[in-house]
C-alpha cells in the first residue's frame, strides 16, 4: 500500500517562520481568535484524518468508482462514512464565516489542510470542495434569506453544492450557453438545459444538492453580459427549511474518465427545474468567478498534494530498491547492490520534486495570505494591493503548480521503473488522477492567456510591476551570506520586468503575439515566484540551527543552480514571437500529404 506522512514540519515552518502567521493573525482583529497553537492543532488533526481515513479508501475508490443506476449516483464503499466524519468534524466550514456555522479560519491555513486531502484522496475532497466554493459565491452575492436558507446546511455537510457552467458546445466561451431561465410570476424561474462535466452533480453523501447554474433569460444581452446565476436545488426547500419535493434537476449519466473515478462527473439535465436568482439578472458571471477563483487555487493544491504523495513514495522506493553500484564506489558492501538512491539521475528527479513541492507549498500559503488580507484587513490601500496580487497570481497558482506537479509525478513513476506502471505501487493512479488538474477550471493554456492578457497587458503591467517591487524590496534586505539566492532572485525579477515590457510593446503591434507567448511567460513568472519563496524560506532557515534548516538552504541552492535557469529559456521562447507559430495554414494540421 502506498505511504503518506503529512509534511507537518514543513507546514509549520512555512506558517510560523516564513510568514509569521501568529503575528499576522493578531494584527487582524477578525483573526484574533486564531493563534499558532490552534493552527498547528488543526493541521495535526487533518493529518490524522488524511492518513487514517481518506488514504485507505483511495485505491479502492478508484477501482470501484462512482456508479450510476436508475438515475442515482452511488459513491464507492467507505465514502459515505468518511464524508460524515469529515462533516461532523467541522472541516467543510473550516474557512467559512462563523455566522453560518463555519470556524472562520484563514485561507493561509486551510490551503495546507486541503493539500493533505488532495495527497491522499483527491476524488473524495472534490465533493466537499465544491460545497465550499458554492458557499463562497452565495455568501458574496446571495440575499440574506438565501444565505440563511442554504449556508448553514452546506457548511454542516447536510447539503452539498455544485457549479454548473459547461455545456456540450460551450466550455471556455460561456457567452454562448443555451440554458434558459424563464421568469415565473412568483419570482422564481424555470431552468431548462443540459450541463456537462459537473463534479458531484449527484451522489449519496448528503440529503440535498444545491446546484449553482448559469443560464440566460429570454431578453438577456448577447454574450457573457447576459449570463445570470440561479440556485437550483435537487430537492426543493420547504418554508421551514426542510427538504421537500424533487426538483426537475437530475443526472442523465456520469462520465467514464481517465482518473478521479470515485468523483462523480455528471451530465445534468434541467427540465424546467425551479430556480432562484442570485443577485441581479445578467450579473451571474461575477458571482460564479468567486467560486472559480477559489477552485483555481484549489487545483494548484491538488497538484502539490499529488506531487508530495508521489515524492514520498518514490523516495522510499529508491531507498529500498537495490540495483547496481555507485559510480564512485561501493556504498553498501554488505549487500549485493547499492540502493538506486546513490545514482545522480534518481536524485535529480527526487530533488526536482522536493524543491518544487516546498516552493509550491510556500507559494500557496503566500497567495492564501493575500486572500486573507482582502477578506480581513480594514486598510483600503493594503486590501487593494492584495487584490492586485491575488488577481495576478491566481492563474500562476493554478497552472504552474499543476504543470510542475505533473512533471514531478511522472518522474516519481520513473523512479519506480516498471513497477511505476503497474497498479500495485499507486503511481499509475496518481498520474491518472492528477492529469485533470491541468484541464479543468480553465485549462492551463487558458490560465496563461489570462495572466498575459487580463492581468498584464490590460493593466499595462501595473500588477506585475507591483509584484516585482515587493520581491526586490525583500531580496535587497537579505544578508550577504544569502547572496546566492538574493542575486538569483534579483536577476530573475529584472528578467521578468524586461520581458513584461517587451510583451506590452509586442502585443500593441501584433494581436497574435500574446497568445503564442502566454504559456512560456506564465512559467517564467512561476519560476520567479518560486525563487522569491526560496528567498523567504532561506531567510527564515538562516536564523535557525539544525539539520532541518540547513537542508532548506541546500535545497534553495539546488533550485538556483538546477531549476531556475529554465527562466532564461522561457524568456527566449517568449521573445521568439508568434510568426513561427502562426505562419502555418490551417490546412497544414490535417493535411498529411
Description of each model-found segment:
Residues 1-125, 145, 149, 372, ...:
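Amphipathic, small/basic residue-rich leader segments at the start of a protein or domain
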Residues 2-5, 19, 90, 183, ...:
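Alpha-helix capping/hinge segments and adjacent helical runs
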Residues 31-33, 63-75, 287-298, 312-353, ...:
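Glycine-rich cofactor-pocket loops
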Residues 79, 130-131, 142-183, 368-387, ...:
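Internal maturation/activation junctions in enzymes
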Residues 100, 112, 458, 473-593:
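C-terminal amphipathic alpha-helical interaction region
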Residues 132-134, 143-146, 150, 443, ...:
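A structural-propensity feature for long, helix-poor, extended segments
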Residues 188, 192-246:
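A short core secondary-structure module
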Residues 197-199, 236-252, 257, 264-295, ...:
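A glycine-rich, basic-preceded beta-loop-alpha segment at the flavin cofactor/substrate interface
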Amino acid at each position: 500500500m502506498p505511504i503518506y506522512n503529512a509534511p507537518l514540519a514543513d507546514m509549520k515552518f512555512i506558517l510560523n517562520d516564513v510568514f509569521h502567521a501568529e503575528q499576522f493573525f493578531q494584527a487582524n482583529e477578525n483573526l484574533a481568535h486564531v493563534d499558532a497553537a490552534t493552527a498547528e492543532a488543526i493541521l495535526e488533526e487533518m493529518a490524522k484524518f488524511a492518513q487514517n481515513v481518506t488514504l485507505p479508501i483511495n485505491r479502492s475508490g478508484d477501482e470501484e468508482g462512482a456508479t450510476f443506476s436508475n438515475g442515482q449516483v452511488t459513491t464507492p464503499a467507505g465514502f459515505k462514512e468518511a464524508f460524515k466524519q469529515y462533516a461532523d468534524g467541522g472541516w467543510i466550514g473550516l474557512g467559512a464565516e462563523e455566522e453560518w456555522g463555519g470556524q472562520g479560519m484563514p485561507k493561509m491555513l486551510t490551503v495546507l489542510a486541503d493539500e493533505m486531502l488532495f495527497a491522499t484522496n483527491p476524488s473524495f475532497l472534490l465533493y466537499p470542495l465544491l460545497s465550499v466554493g458554492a458557499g463562497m459565491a452565495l455568501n458574496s452575492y446571495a440575499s440574506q434569506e438565501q444565505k440563511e436558507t442554504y449556508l448553514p446546511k452546506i457548511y454542516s455537510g447536510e447539503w452539498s453544492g455544485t457549479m454548473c457552467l459547461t455545456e456540450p458546445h460551450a466550455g471556455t466561451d460561456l457567452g454562448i450557453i443555451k440554458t434558459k431561465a424563464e421568469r415565473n410570476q412568483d419570482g422564481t424561474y424555470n431552468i431548462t438545459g443540459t450541463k456537462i462535466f459537473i463534479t458531484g452533480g449527484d451522489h449519496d453523501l448528503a440529503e440535498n444538492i444545491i446546484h449553482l447554474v448559469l443560464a440566460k433569460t429570454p431578453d438577456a444581452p448577447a454574450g457573457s453580459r447576459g449570463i445570470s446565476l440561479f440556485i437550483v436545488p435537487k430537492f426543493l426547500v420547504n418554508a421551514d427549511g426542510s427538504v421537500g419535493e424533487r426538483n426537475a434537476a437530475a443526472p442523465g449519466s456520469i462520465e467514464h474518465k481517465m482518473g478521479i473515478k470515485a468523483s462523480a462527473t455528471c451530465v445534468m439535465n434541467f427540465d424546467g427545474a425551479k430556480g432562484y436568482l442570485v443577485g441581479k439578472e445578467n450579473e451571474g458571471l461575477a458571482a460564479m468567478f468567486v467560486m472559480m477563483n477559489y477552485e483555481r487555487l484549489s487545483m494548484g493544491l491538488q497538484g502539490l498534494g499529488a506531487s508530495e504523495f508521489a515524492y514520498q513514495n518514490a523516495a522510499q522506493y529508491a531507498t529500498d530498491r537495490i540495483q547496481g553500484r555507485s559510480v564512485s564506489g561501493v556504498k553498501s558492501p554488505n549487500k549485493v547492490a547499492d540502493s538506486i538512491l546513490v545514482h545522480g539521475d534518481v536524485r535529480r528527479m527526487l530533488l526536482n520534486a522536493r524543491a518544487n513541492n516546498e516552493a509550491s507549498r510556500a507559494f500557496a500559503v503566500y497567495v492564501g495570505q493575500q486572500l486573507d488580507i482582502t477578506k480581513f484587513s480594514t486598510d483600503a490601500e493594503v486590501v487593494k494591493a492584495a487584490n492586485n496580487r491575488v488577481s495576478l497570481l491566481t492563474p500562476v497558482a493554478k497552472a504552474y503548480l499543476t504543470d510542475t506537479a505533473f512533471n514531478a509525478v511522472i518522474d516519481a513513476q520513473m523512479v519506480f521503473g516498471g513497477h511505476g506502471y503497474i497498479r500495485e505501487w499507486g503511481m499509475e493512479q496518481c498520474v491518472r488522477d492528477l492529469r485533470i488538474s491541468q484541464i479543468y477550471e480553465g485549462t492551463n493554456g487558458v490560465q496563461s492567456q489570462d495572466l498575459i492578457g487580463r492581468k498584464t497587458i490590460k493593466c499595462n503591467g501595473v500588477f506585475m510591476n507591483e509584484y516585482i517591487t515587493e520581491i526586490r524590496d525583500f531580496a535587497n534586505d537579505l544578508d550577504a551570506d544569502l547572496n546566492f539566492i538574493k542575486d538569483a532572485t534579483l536577476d530573475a525579477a529584472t528578467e521578468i520586468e524586461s520581458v513584461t515590457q517587451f510583451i506590452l510593446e509586442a502585443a500593441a503591434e501584433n494581436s497574435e503575439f500574446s497568445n503564442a507567448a502566454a504559456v512560456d511567460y506564465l512559467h517564467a513568472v512561476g519560476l520567479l515566484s518560486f525563487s522569491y519563496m526560496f528567498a523567504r524560506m532561506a531567510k527564515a532557515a538562516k536564523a535557525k540551527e539544525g539539520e532541518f534548516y540547513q537542508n532548506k538552504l541546500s535545497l534553495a541552492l539546488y533550485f538556483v543552480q538546477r531549476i531556475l535557469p529554465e527562466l532564461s529559456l522561457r524568456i527566449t521562447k517568449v521573445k521568439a514571437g508568434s510568426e513561427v507559430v502562426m505562419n502555418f495554414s490551417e490546412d497544414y494540421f490535417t493535411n498529411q500529404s
